[in-house]
From Swiss-Prot:
Name under which the protein is recorded: Probable cytosolic iron-sulfur protein assembly protein CIAO1
Species assigned in the record: Rattus norvegicus (Rat)
HAMAP family xrefs: ciao1 (MF_03037)
Family: Belongs to the WD repeat CIA1 family.
Motif LYR motif per record, residues: 176-178
Compartments in which it is found: Cytoplasm
Subunit structure: Component of the CIA complex. Interacts with CIAO2A and forms a complex with CIAO2B and MMS19; the interactions with CIAO2A and CIAO2B are mutually exclusive. Interacts with CHD1L, ERCC2, IREB2 and POLD1. Component of the MMXD complex, which includes CIAO1, ERCC2, CIAO2B, MMS19 and SLC25A5. Interacts with WT1. Interacts with CIAO3. Interacts (via LYR motif) with HSC20.
Primary residence: cytoplasm
One BP term from GO: iron-sulfur cluster assembly
UniProt keyword Repeat present: yes
Record SMART domains: WD40 (SM00320)
CC annotations in GO: cytoplasm; cytosolic [4Fe-4S] assembly targeting complex; MMXD complex
Length: 339
């Protein structure tokens, strides 16, 4: 297990600052990082080395907490503690801030694009989730403000193929939203974590959702459609989500991020104990009660809290991580034999 994660490269991405989050572009050729220095950096390869291709420093007045690429790869959205979200347009190696989205009362904690590229979601410490519509002229309009959470909303993520939105909060819950008529509504609340839910990730099929928490567990939730063979109760025509697996006893501190590889199904976590862990579903495990094994555990992946893990969308096994130590690390994950 010790050789399952091999360091490929390490770069001082945000020196003297925290590096908060990472996002690969859709082709897996560029990685965006953001940090407490108010900057966004774009990383790419030259030969065998990862180098900084661009620095986006003009958009925000405070910490940049999250970044997200549009599905077409031509835009990057950044969420900041200055209560704004910037939309950057890519022009070869340069990026220009073309729009600043305002409206949240305080820190914007996360931003995510829908798979169509026509919708954007943001969430904030003001307890709200906003859904924005993007038109052909690149104009952004808020079409819904969702106030389902009772505390700070930490993370938003879209289903990989449907317009289904999920959010994670300091109120210990995960909520799911869909469009009904002309508005967005909360269609499910996932309860079970005993403390803040920091991050969530859909599996490649979108039928399962992983959540990670301050309670040091990862929970796997499965979607059940009305009339399902397992007899899981559903409310009307809305699917039901049920916790089918809890990964506990593996992490010694808060789990800040969880990432589900869209190519292999491997599940990576970023933890406050400075470690990165990878889990794989056991072969032949029951889909209704899946079991997962720890296949990689790198104890000193960083010198401080690990904030984010991100699988490359095109190159299986390439994992990036970032930390309070300001560094970004690139790892090669080797799947154990027999899986």
């Amino acid at each position: 297990m010790k050789d399952a994660l091999v360091l490929q490269s390490r770069v001082p991405a945000h020196p003297d600052s925290r590096c908060w989050f990472l996002a690969w572009n859709p082709t897996g050729t560029l990685l965006a990082s953001c940090g407490g220095d108010r900057k966004i950096r774009i990383w790419g390869t030259e030969g065998d080395s990862w180098i900084c291709k661009s620095v986006l420093s003009e958009g925000h007045q405070r910490t940049v907490r999250k970044v997200a690429w549009s599905p077409c790869g031509n835009y990057l959205a950044s969420a900041s503690f200055d209560a704004t979200t910037c939309i950057w347009k890519k022009n070869q190696d340069d990026f220009e801030c073309v729009t600043t989205l305002e409206g949240h009362e305080n820190e914007v904690k996360s931003v995510a694009w829908a798979p169509s590229g026509n919708l954007l979601a943001t969430c904030s410490r003001d307890k709200s989730v906003w859904v924005w519509e993007v038109d052909e002229e690149d104009e952004y309009e808020c079409v819904s403000v969702l106030n389902s959470h009772t505390q700070d909303v930490k993370h938003v993520v879209w289903h990989p193929s449907q317009e289904l939105l999920a959010s994670a909060s300091y109120d210990d819950t995960v909520k799911l939203y869909q469009e009904e008529g002309d508005d967005w509504v909360c269609c499910a609340t996932l309860e079970g974590h005993e403390s803040t839910v920091w991050s969530i990730a859909f599996d490649p099929s979108g039928q399962r959702l992983a959540s990670c928490s301050d309670d040091r567990t990862v929970r796997i939730w499965r979607q059940y459609l009305p009339g399902n063979e397992q007899g899981v109760a559903c409310s009307g025509s809305d699917p039901s989500w049920k916790c089918v697996c809890t990964l506990s006893g593996f992490h010694t501190r808060t789990i800040y991020d969880v990432a589900w590889c869209q190519l292999t199904g491997a599940l990576a976590t970023a933890c406050g104990d400075d470690a990165i862990r990878v889990f794989e579903e056991d072969p032949g495990s029951d889909p209704q009660q899946p079991t997962f094994s720890l296949t990689a555990h790198l104890r000193q992946a960083h010198s401080q809290d690990v904030n984010c893990v991100a699988w490359n969308p095109k190159e299986a096994g390439l994992l990036a991580s970032c930390s309070d130590d300001g560094e970004v690390a690139f790892w090669e994950y080797h799947q154990p034999a027999g899986l």
